[in-house]
C-alpha cells in the first residue's frame, strides 16, 4: 500500500502495467486517458474489467494505470494482471476466487525467436522438387 493507494504490477508478453487502486466511483484511467479512449477493441475492455466483475468491485475503485511496451492485447492482459495483484494487495481473501479464474498466474507465453535458415520461427523456405 502506497498512501491510500493499493499497488500491483502486471506483465503480459512485452507489456508492463503499473496499477494503482483506491476507493472511489469506478473511474479507470490508462496513461492519462479514460479506458474507453485508450483501448479501441471491446475485447480489450472486457479483459481489463474481468477481475473487477468477478469480485463485484466494478464501481468501488478508482484505478490509475501506467502501461508500456507491447500491443493492445498484451497491454490489456498486463493491466488485468496488475488489477488482480492490486486487488489482492487490497484484500487477500479475494485471491482464491481470482486464482481459480486464472487471473493471478502470469501468462508466460512469449514470442518464439526467428531461427537462422528459416523464414520465421518455424516456417521453412518453400521446397521445390524440380
UniProtKB/Swiss-Prot annotation:
PROSITE patterns: RIBOSOMAL_S9
Molecular function in Gene Ontology: RNA binding; structural constituent of ribosome
A single GO cellular-component term on record: cytosolic small ribosomal subunit
InterPro entries linked to this entry: Ribosomal_Su5_D2-typ_SF, Ribosomal_uS9, Ribosomal_uS9_bac/plastid, Ribosomal_uS9_CS, Ribsml_uS5_D2-typ_fold_subgr
Keywords associated with the record: Ribonucleoprotein, Ribosomal protein
GO biological process: translation
Pfam families: Ribosomal_S9
Keyword Ribosomal protein: yes
Family listed: Belongs to the universal ribosomal protein uS9 family.
Cited PANTHER family: RIBOSOMAL PROTEIN S9, SMALL RIBOSOMAL SUBUNIT PROTEIN US9M
Stated name of the protein: Small ribosomal subunit protein uS9
Lineage of the species this protein comes from: Bacteria, Pseudomonadati, Pseudomonadota, Betaproteobacteria, Burkholderiales
